[in-house]
From Swiss-Prot:
NDH-1 shuttles electrons from NADH, via FMN and iron-sulfur (Fe-S) centers, to quinones in the respiratory chain. The immediate electron acceptor for the enzyme in this species is believed to be ubiquinone. Couples the redox reaction to proton translocation (for every two electrons transferred, four hydrogen ions are translocated across the cytoplasmic membrane), and thus conserves the redox energy in a proton gradient. The gene is nuoB2. It comes from Roseiflexus sp. (strain RS-1). This is NADH-quinone oxidoreductase subunit B 2. Its cofactor is [4Fe-4S] cluster. Transmembrane segments: none annotated. GO terms for biological process: aerobic respiration; electron transport coupled proton transport.
Length: 167
């Protein structure tokens, strides 16, 4: 009989250190917003009173990558902007996660030319893709929930990054 059964309904919570750390990481993500096109407008809408991202622990958007652990890339990335995205990603502290918001961030969208990166995953590893042109705030929130679930499944020594595709 384990401690969980012995404690019963005494108000004692048992958890591993790994579960506690992952709960903290998923409950207090600090986003660095990288809005490059029309998806940024929907990203701003997700932070309004109707959707309230603060209930997911994202009250404050970080202006410095050194204070952020989540980068949300919203919109198309040009070849000239690619080194900036990479530099900001490299300046973020580990562990760090990336959400590619919108079709342009995921695959270049309708801009199939030499000046546009065909997916931000060519520059940085992406954890969650949020589809849409532009995706609604509900889709971004769904992507954030998927990322929280992924973070809660991580080991303390890390895991292989597998992107989650949303329909």
């Amino acid at each position: 009989m384990g401690i969980e059964q012995k404690a019963g309904d005494m108000g004692i919570v048992t958890a591993s250190l790994e579960q506690l750390v992952n709960w903290s990481r998923s409950s207090a993500m600090w986003p660095l917003l990288f809005g490059l096109a029309c998806c940024a407008i929907e990203m701003m809408g997700a932070q309004g009173a109707n959707y309230d991202l603060s209930r997911f622990g994202m009250e404050i958007n970080r202006a410095s990558p050194r204070q952020a652990d989540l980068m949300i890339v919203a919109g198309r990335v040009s070849r000239k902007m690619a080194p900036v995205v990479r530099r900001l990603y490299d300046q973020m502290a580990d562990p760090k996660w990336v959400i590619a918001m919108g079709d342009c961030a995921a695959c270049g969208g309708v801009f199939n030319n030499y000046a546009i990166v065909q997916g931000v995953d060519e520059i940085v590893p992406v954890d969650v893709y949020v589809a849409g042109c532009p995706p609604r705030p509900e889709a971004l929130i769904d992507g954030i929930i998927h990322l929280h679930e992924k973070v809660k499944r991580m080991r303390l020594d890390g895991e292989l990054r597998e992107p989650v595709r949303l329909s």
